[in-house]
């Protein structure tokens, strides 16, 4: 019974992924929802070389894992250079920004979920229909 529940959840994630749109967050930076649940949200972000995410903050905690590329994370005015395989954690409401040093792909996980992003996904899906 326990395995059936896990398999059902896994199927839901696999079925959801293909319908998620790619959304531009800001020039040169796109995101695509990978999965979400009641307490977490995960997305794949693609950042063009030289792109910049201005300083911002959000109420969610965030964990970022760099899949490929190189970026400069700026927290409290202090730059941190990160590359393939690096991960970092940001607490709620911590101002941060990013500058890419090469084309970069990251896996972002937020808790609680980014309901704002999910609402945009749904709006885009409805516009396509």
Residue ranges of predicted features:
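Ligand-binding loop in jelly-roll beta-barrel domains
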Residues: 92-116
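A cytosolic small-molecule/anion-sensing beta-strand core signal
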Residues: 67-68, 83, 102
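Short acidic-glycine-tyrosine-enriched beta hairpin
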Residues: 77-92
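Short, conserved beta-strand element in jelly-roll/cupin
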Residues: 46-48, 58-73
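Structural motif
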Residues: 63, 70-72, 79, 95, ...
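Conserved short histidine dyad/triad with adjacent acidic residue
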Residues: 27, 43-57
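A short, N-terminal "cap"/entry segment at the start of jelly-roll beta-barrel domains
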Residues: 1-39, 119-129
């Amino acid at each position: 019974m326990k395995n059936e529940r896990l398999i059902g959840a896994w199927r839901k994630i696999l079925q959801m992924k293909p319908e998620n749109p790619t959304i531009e967050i800001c020039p040169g930076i796109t995101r695509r929802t990978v999965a979400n649940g009641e307490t977490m949200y995960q997305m794949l972000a693609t950042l063009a070389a030289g792109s910049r995410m201005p300083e911002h903050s959000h109420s969610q905690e965030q964990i970022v894992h760099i899949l490929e590329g190189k970026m400069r994370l700026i927290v409290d005015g202090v730059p941190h250079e990160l590359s393939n395989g690096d991960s970092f954690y940001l607490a709620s409401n911590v101002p941060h920004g990013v500058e890419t040093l090469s084309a970069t792909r990251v896996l972002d996980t937020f808790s609680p979920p980014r309901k704002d992003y999910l609402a945009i996904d749904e709006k885009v899906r409805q516009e396509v229909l």
